[in-house]
Every structure is written in C-alpha cells, then in structure tokens.
C-alpha cells in the first residue's frame, strides 16, 4: 500500500500522511467471525487504572483470527482483504472447499482469488505466500511469519504489520529463527509458520498529523513523570527541568523500576534457555 499525503488546507493536514488502503473490501466484516469488544478505559475489575493512556476511541468489533491453521490439506480461496481496527496488519477472508470461512493475517503479496492451504507435507512447488507448514518442512533462509512458540497453541510471534522471521536452520527437533530485532532463538521444529511476511509494511511510515486522530484510536495523552508533582511520580518535583530529591539518582518508572541502562527481563524466565544470541549481539549468561 502507498502512503497518501494531503494538501495543507489545515495545520493537521500539512503533517498527515496515511495508508491509501487500496484493494481492501468496504463491506462489513463477517458477523460469525466477530465478537463484541467492550471498552475498559485501562481499568481492572476494581476500577483502578492498570494500563495508562487508554480510553475513548471509536467502537470496534473484534475479528476472530485463525492463528492455528488446523484445517489441513484443504485448499482455501482468498475472498477479500479487509481492514482490522484491532491490529496494524490487514486480514484476508479465506473460504475453504467445504464452505467454511476464516480470517487470517494478510501476508505481503497475497491477492484476492489466490489459493492457499495448510499441510503436514510439502513439495518444492508448495512454498507460496500464505501457505502454512511445520518449520521442519520449510527450507532454510525462508521468510516466515505467524510462528508458534508451542506446537498447537497458535501463532504468537511475527504478527505485526511488515514483520517477518528468517528460518536460519533446522537441526533435529529444534529450529533456529532470526527475530526482527536480530535475536537468534530456538523453537520446536513442529511449530507451524506461514510463508512470507506480514503485509501493510507502510504502517510505520504513517504520520497521524493531529492528536485527535490518536484519540480516535483510543489512546490518551502521555505526560512525562518529570513534569508531575512528587506525589504523582517518583521523578516529579524539583526546580525547572529536573527531577525532585528523595535520594534517587536515576530516572525510574512510575512504580520505581530503573528506566535507564537496567535490564528489566527476568533472569529466571524459562524461555531464556531458548535464546542463542540476544538482540544486542551478546550471548546469554553462561553460554559460550
């Protein structure tokens, strides 16, 4: 999709550039594949704010997406490409040979009318965009997206617009993936993945142009902790552009977590054992 800029008839229009959304269906989503999406305002069941900067925005329906791709060896036809307000990528509405309809993430290059399928066996001519296979059947150096972390639990990584992983190698029951961050990670070779990269790669090149468009998306303003009062934030108070006292020498989060130069990932996290090289090029502790 191309980026569309506007004539500067208003101050907001001068700075706005948006996706054209060419080729997307203008029909309403499939009713059987949607659910209500109630607003929370970032509050939990006790009414306390647990996630800041959430509130308002346009009403949205949640689209039920097939992340498992568990209908095997049955061809499906892409009926339409649709916009999804709940994520950065677009969706593809596919119709299987038995008439069942599903939403999947729309890969880059997938066209209306294309034939796709998922299978546990593959030949040389089957590695087309949108087809889904276990990692051990996919050739090395292939770009994939919507990859499972645990077999059968559905895709968990590489689901945002424009993202994709590189399948580096498959050795035994483990596959090595290169993440968009540069991290090298091991996953079970039985995990499923979809060929290609997620579409709508120009999403990051958009400029919303005005605060109101961000509010339409349900995002409220962000206030820096340094300009708050001491009662509202650990970095609040002080004279001018400086944080207050209280014995702190470093910037912290609203809950006191060090914000600069401090690794926030837990060392006890189980998936640490599956990381070969971190995104910064360093190997995990204890690995040579």
UniProtKB/Swiss-Prot annotation:
Chain segments carrying region Disordered: 1-46, 226-288
GO molecular function: rRNA binding; structural constituent of ribosome; transferase activity
GO BP, sorted A to Z: cytoplasmic translation
Residue ranges with Gly residues bias: 235-248
Superkingdom classification of source: Bacteria
Pfam family, one: Ribosomal_L2_C
Basic residues composition-biased segments: 279-288
Residue ranges crossing the lipid bilayer per the database entry: none
GO CC annotation, single: large ribosomal subunit
Keywords for the protein's UniProt record, in alphabetical order: Ribonucleoprotein, Ribosomal protein, RNA-binding, rRNA-binding
Function: One of the primary rRNA binding proteins. Required for association of the 30S and 50S subunits to form the 70S ribosome, for tRNA binding and peptide bond formation. It has been suggested to have peptidyltransferase activity; this is somewhat controversial. Makes several contacts with the 16S rRNA in the 70S ribosome.
Family, as annotated: Belongs to the universal ribosomal protein uL2 family.
HAMAP family: Ribosomal_uL2_B
Quaternary organization: Part of the 50S ribosomal subunit. Forms a bridge to the 30S subunit in the 70S ribosome.
Protein name: Large ribosomal subunit protein uL2
Gene name per UniProt: rplB
């Amino acid at each position: 999709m191309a980026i569309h800029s506007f004539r500067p008839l208003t101050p907001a229009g001068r700075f706005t550039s948006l996706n054209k959304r060419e080729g997307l269906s203008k029909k309403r989503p499939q009713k059987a594949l949607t659910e209500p999406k109630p607003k929370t305002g970032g509050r939990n069941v006790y009414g306390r704010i647990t996630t800041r900067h959430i509130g308002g925005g346009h009403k949205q329906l949640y689209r039920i997406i097939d992340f498992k791709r568990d209908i095997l060896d049955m061809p499906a036809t892409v009926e339409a490409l649709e916009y999804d307000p709940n994520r950065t990528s677009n969706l593809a509405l596919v119709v299987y040979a038995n008439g069942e309809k599903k939403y999947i993430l729309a890969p880059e290059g997938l066209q209306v009318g294309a034939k796709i399928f998922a299978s546990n066996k593959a030949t040389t001519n089957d590695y087309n965009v949108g087809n889904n296979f276990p990692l051990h059947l996919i050739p090395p150096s292939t770009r994939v997206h919507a990859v499972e972390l645990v077999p059968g639990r559905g895709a968990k990584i590489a689901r945002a617009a424009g993202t994709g992983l590189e399948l580096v190698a498959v050795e035994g029951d483990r596959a090595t993936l290169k993440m968009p961050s540069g991290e090298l990670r091991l996953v079970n070779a039985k995990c499923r993945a979809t060929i290609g990269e997620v579409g709508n790669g120009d999403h990051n090149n958009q400029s919303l142009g005005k605060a109101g468009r961000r509010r339409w998306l349900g995002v409220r303003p962000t206030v820096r902790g340094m300009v708050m009062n001491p009662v509202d934030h650990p970095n609040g108070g002080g004279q001018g552009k400086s944080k207050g006292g209280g014995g702190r020498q470093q910037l912290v989060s609203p809950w006191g977590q060090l914000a600069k130069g401090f690794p926030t990932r837990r060392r006890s996290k189980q998936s640490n054992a599956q990381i070969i090289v971190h995104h910064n090029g360093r190997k995990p502790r204890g690995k040579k």
